């Protein structure tokens, strides 16, 4: 593993609810944008202790830490490597902290034109405009 970067874990919930599984609703072209760069592994002493914020149109939707992840990064890599060959260049997504629209009492799903900004301590910030096709 060479390092860490931000990956915007986009989901098309309408497709996921219809299909009753997540694969197609996360695999749409343009989903999972990542960046803004790779921070090398040696620059991050504890990847399980990074502050994470997600804003939609400037409104904070997620304010958490990688310490709150359900499965630690090392365990994710170990588990995946048992069933598949991990190759240089592979990207492994750890998922997202609490605060996704689906879990809200009154869900605020992303709309055409919304701007999503994700910041992870020491990894930078990515901004993506939602465009419906």
Language-model-detected regions and their locations in the chain:
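Catalytic-pocket segment enriched in acidic/His residues
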Residues: 13-133
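N-terminal accessory regions of nucleic-acid-interacting proteins
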Residues: 1-4
């Amino acid at each position: 593993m060479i390092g860490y970067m931000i990956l915007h874990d986009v989901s098309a919930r309408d497709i996921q609810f219809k299909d009753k599984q997540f694969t197609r609703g996360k695999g749409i072209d343009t989903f999972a944008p990542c960046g803004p760069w790779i921070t090398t592994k040696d620059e991050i002493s504890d990847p399980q202790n990074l502050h994470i914020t997600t804003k939609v149109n400037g409104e904070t939707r997620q304010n958490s830490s990688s310490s709150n992840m359900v499965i630690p990064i090392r365990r994710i890599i170990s588990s995946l490597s048992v069933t598949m060959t991990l190759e240089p260049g592979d990207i492994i997504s750890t998922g997202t902290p609490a605060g996704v629209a689906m879990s809200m009492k009154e869900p605020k799903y992303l709309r055409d034109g919304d701007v999503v900004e994700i910041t992870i301590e020491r990894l930078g910030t990515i901004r993506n405009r939602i465009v419906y096709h």
